[in-house]
Amino acid sequence: DPDQPKVHPVGQIKMVKPLGVDHQKETGLLLVTNANPRYSFQIFSGTQSSQWLDYLDDQFQFVESLPKGLQDLLTVRLYFHDYAWEQEKRWNERFSNIALDLGKKNINELIAKSRLYVATYNAGTYLQSFTMNIPTVIFWNSKHWEIRDAAIPYFDELKRVGIFHETPESAAFHVSEVWDDIDGWWKSKPVRDVLEQFKSQYCDIDCDLTGNIEAELRAESNKF
């Protein structure tokens, strides 16, 4: 990012690898959710305080927009820190048929049983799913999760191939459209090309990580 001269890409530091799962053969649909403190204490691009209730409503709208058959296959992973929002209670009051994970289980156990991974907030969650080659759909309200100008072209490309959505309805429709042939979508050339471009910019693992870090540190030290 030319507007961030002090930030230098070196690669993805948290190394994750594919689980060796043929996701097309799995039956689960995994929705990974987030929560935030009830009171604002810092300013960043994301839901603040009671905006989380709008975020939760988007999650409910996503589920309601899915066909009944997919709702029955869905597991919702709640954020491990509840912040007194009573996530589990709210979900159970809205949906009696949805499986909930309280965020305590190793997420890889859920991923291994899932055909598709749905990320709902802008953090490392989808970067890791990309590098693990898990079929992934992302959606969030762009008024809550704003991205910097330099990143917009990359997300526009994700949107073009059906990975990124700005409404829960659009995401749910796409999930239902590709569900029966995930590989036909996820392994298609347009999707692979966009993913490779995005990963090379934001979550590159095919690089000399330690060498890149050393080179950047030496370059900085030589300035003094």
Give the residues covered by each predicted segment.
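Short, surface-exposed amphipathic charged segments that create phosphate/polyanion-binding patches used
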Residues: 20-30, 112-120, 178-182
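Soluble or luminal CAZymes and related metallo-dependent hydrolases
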Residues: 51-59, 170, 205-209
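C-terminal alpha-helical cap of glycosyltransferases
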Residues: 200-224
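Conserved catalytic-core segment of nucleotide-activated headgroup transferases in glycan assembly
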Residues: 3-90
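Hydrophobic transmembrane helix bundles of membrane-integrated enzymes that assemble
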Residues: 30-33, 67, 118, 138-139, ...
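Donor nucleotide-activated moiety binding/catalytic core segment of transferases
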Residues: 12-14, 72-127, 131-132, 142-143
